[in-house]
Amino acid sequence: MKPILISALTFIVFLTLGCREQSSSKIGTDELQAIFPKGELGPAENFTGRAWNFGLVSNDTTYTTLVGNVYFEPGARSNWHTHPAGQILVITDGVGYHQIEGQARQTIKKGDVVKCPPNVMHWHGASHESGLQQLYIIPNTEKGIVQWMHPVSEEEYNYTK
């Protein structure tokens, strides 16, 4: 009986350590849990680094809402931009950053929900070490969808205050 108990306890200890090690590892390019296909590579004039967009709900006159999934590779980010009716981000995996003009950069992670107010300049993207996957929701598209601005500089991307 004692050898069975020792074997069972040893198995539980190794299982626990293995799970702990896996959960504390960094989330890089290939380690995010994909919910949707990667989609199309975002245009270089709107993104620094590689960001992939997969549309989920197309714009129409009934729902007037766009929904899609964006995957940012580590270090990738959007340009500064605005949305006439605002934007909601639901972070589904990874770690990244979001910043509203004039405010401190915020760290965002899986499970976070970010509300970008209408006509307020902001950017979002992956952290240095981790990819970021997000759902975006753009409501009231009859007001317009997005106005792209200039790229986020390295200084802005790295500035934490």
Model-based region annotation:
Residues 1-26:
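Bacterial Sec-dependent N-terminal signal peptides
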Residues 80, 98-99, 122-127:
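Short beta-strand His + acidic residue motifs that chelate non-heme Fe in jelly-roll/DSBH
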Residues 69-73, 82-98, 137-139:
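Short, conserved beta-strand element in jelly-roll/cupin
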Residues 19-64, 145-161:
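A short, N-terminal "cap"/entry segment at the start of jelly-roll beta-barrel domains
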Residues 76, 98, 132:
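Ligand-binding pocket scaffold of soluble enzyme catalytic domains
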